[in-house]
């Protein structure tokens, strides 16, 4: 190491990395398997061939659930400063937070009615 | 060894029994298999699907035909290479797998041509890019058509054909479904491939007591034991469909070992399954069938689970002497059908224990474990038309639960016809 000096070490690492990359590439070529035949590649659903591509635009219904979760997540954020002043402010803070949660809860009930929580 | 098994006509139970051997691993997809085991005769209508199944097994692969009484040449048309074995199936399959893996036995070439139904190549030097990705025909295949979603959006409706060798469905059942996401929006059931001339008239010697009871007196004890075993075999399969395969294996072992009058293990099994909430959640309220829809269909346990006391045995004097009364449930959902079959298995074992040497009088029709069986058709043929209406609007998982709970056996009808035909020829 000392003989090579810092530049020599860097060069050695560089050469070794290139050799390793070549080795990996060549071994991959040597081991290459023949391509799968079409029937071997086609998806299995019981023996019949697919007629359309599997790319399928479907409704990701969990995103509305994710939005509802986000709303309640933010509510928790509001609760931290509220908890700090709650003892000082007393009953009035309790009522205010109650109103806030009630409004959010109405939103949840509305989402429920709109079948947001049905997974499929 | 990993085996993909296809049960042809009259071989359902023998194929199921292979699970009992510790060396056998019956896999759910040909991708995981080394050996394609075909039991019995397969109708010509399914030959192409079978060939496609064969070709999707990775190399090295081997096809093994287990005739089980089917005449030679019943199926071999499109299969130039195969090994026929008669008995000691697990041992022979192990030997074949060892030969395949050590290279002593060559892997089978594909049957279908290596031609892509939708060839596609992009504009780039490596076949990438071009209009294929965004032009509505990705990689040469058209995309699914649009359909209305319940939110008022227009999204893809994916056409999907499931079967005839989908492992959760009875062999031969082909569903042409259209899926919007996870929901089945349109379902059509193809004709029963087993009700064709290509499998009729097979040598059906050694068939079950229910088929024999169509034409000759059979002892009640034998019939009821067979009924209890058939119900337990269904439970074993249905548990495997619920991904409770280990419990299913225990039930299968029970089904093969249970004896008349010995209903205690079945009762405790019913209790355990009743407690199993995972099973309850996936079956309660799923696949509900109204009694009116089942009126006159002779759907056996399915009808009785919906509250119809529909049982041919109630008209038989020998059964009435034993104090037989049909068990019925009220709910008519998949959970009720589970309970119904377990309760009937218990009842059948008790009846079998008390039956003595009573025998049936052949009347040309019999109450089989799946319902009214007669040469003109089995219960599966009468239940198939109900399926599209039942499954539409369901999630895919619920649809599988429902289909499994109906216990269809597409091959039974042709077997009954074959039995009557065989009797006519013999006399």
Where is each model-derived feature located?
Chain B
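Metal/cofactor-centered catalytic core regions of large enzymes
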Residues: 86-93, 97-427
């Amino acid at each position: 190491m000392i003989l090579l000096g810092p530049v020599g070490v860097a060069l050695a690492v560089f050469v070794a990395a290139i050799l390793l990359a070549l080795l990996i590439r060549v071994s991959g070529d040597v081991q290459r398997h023949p391509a799968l035949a079409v029937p071997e590649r086609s998806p299995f659903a019981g023996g019949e061939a697919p007629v359309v591509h599997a790319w399928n635009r479907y409704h990701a219904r969990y995103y509305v659930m994710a939005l509802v979760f986000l709303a309640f997540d933010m509510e928790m954020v509001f609760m931290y400063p509220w908890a700090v002043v709650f003892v000082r402010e007393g009953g009035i803070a309790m009522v205010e937070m109650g109103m806030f949660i009630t409004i959010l809860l109405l939103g949840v009930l509305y989402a429920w009615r709109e079948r947001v929580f049905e997974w499929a | 060894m990993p085996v993909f098994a296809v049960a042809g006509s009259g071989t359902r139970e023998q194929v199921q029994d292979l699970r009992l051997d510790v060396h056998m691993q019956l896999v759910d997809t040909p991708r995981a298999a080394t050996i394609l085991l075909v039991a019995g005769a397969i109708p010509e209508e399914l030959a192409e699907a079978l060939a496609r199944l064969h070709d999707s097994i990775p190399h090295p692969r081997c096809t093994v035909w287990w005739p089980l009484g089917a005449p030679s040449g019943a199926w071999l048309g499109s299969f130039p290479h195969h090994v026929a074995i008669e008995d000691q199936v697990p041992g022979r399959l192990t030997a074949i797998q060892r030969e395949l893996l050590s290279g002593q036995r060559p892997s089978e070439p594909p049957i279908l041509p290596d031609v892509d139904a939708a060839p596609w190549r992009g504009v780039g030097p490596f076949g990438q890019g071009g209009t294929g990705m965004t032009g509505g025909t990705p990689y040469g295949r058209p995309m699914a058509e649009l359909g209305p979603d319940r939110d008022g959006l227009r999204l893809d409706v994916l056409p999907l054909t499931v079967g005839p060798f989908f492992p959760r469905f009875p062999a031969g059942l082909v569903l042409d479904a259209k899926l919007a996401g996870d929901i089945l929006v349109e379902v059509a059931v193809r004709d029963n491939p087993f009700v064709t001339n290509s499998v009729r008239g097979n040598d059906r010697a050694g068939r079950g007591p229910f088929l024999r009871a169509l034409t000759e007196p059979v002892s009640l004890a034998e019939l009821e034991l067979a009924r209890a075993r058939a119900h337990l075999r269904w439970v074993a399969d249905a548990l495997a469909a619920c991904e409770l395969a280990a419990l299913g294996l225990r039930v299968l072992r029970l089904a093969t070992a249970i004896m008349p009058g010995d209903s205690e293990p079945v009762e405790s099994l019913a209790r355990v399954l009743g407690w199993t909430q995972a099973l309850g959640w996936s079956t309660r309220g799923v696949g509900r069938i109204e009694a009116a829809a089942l009126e006159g269909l002779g759907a056996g346990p399915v009808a009785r689970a919906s509250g119809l006391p529909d049982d041919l045995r109630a008209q038989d004097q020998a059964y009435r002497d034993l104090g037989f009364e049909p068990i019925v449930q009220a709910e008519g959902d998949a959970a009720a059908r589970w309970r119904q079959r377990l309760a009937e298995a218990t009842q059948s074992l008790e009846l079998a224990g008390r039956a003595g040497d009573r025998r049936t009088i052949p009347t040309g029709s019999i109450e089989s474990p799946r319902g009214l069986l007669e040469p003109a058709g089995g219960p599966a043929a009468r239940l198939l038309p109900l399926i599209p209406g039942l499954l539409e609007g369901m999630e895919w998982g619920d649809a599988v639960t429902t289909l499994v709970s109906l216990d269809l056996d597409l091959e039974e009808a042709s077997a009954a016809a074959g039995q009557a035909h065989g009797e006519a020829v013999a006399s």
